[in-house]
Amino acid sequence: MREKYILRCTECKNENYIGKNDKKKEKIEVKKFCSNCNKHELHKQKK
């Protein structure tokens, strides 16, 4: 079963991206564009 996750910007704490993945113990960390900060920032998976 695939599980939804939300990526949150580490700078402004804005929730920008939603995705699905297999259930894993590791948290996802990706550098993506934040429309609120208007630049590329590190996004981490919300708890």
From Swiss-Prot:
One of its GO terms (biological process) is translation. SUPFAM superfamilies: Zn-binding ribosomal proteins. Keywords: Ribonucleoprotein, Ribosomal protein. It comes from the Bacteria. GO terms for molecular function: structural constituent of ribosome. The keyword Ribosomal protein applies. One of its GO terms (cellular component) is cytoplasm. Belongs to the bacterial ribosomal protein bL33 family. This is Large ribosomal subunit protein bL33B. It comes from Mesoplasma florum (strain ATCC 33453 / NBRC 100688 / NCTC 11704 / L1) (Acholeplasma florum).
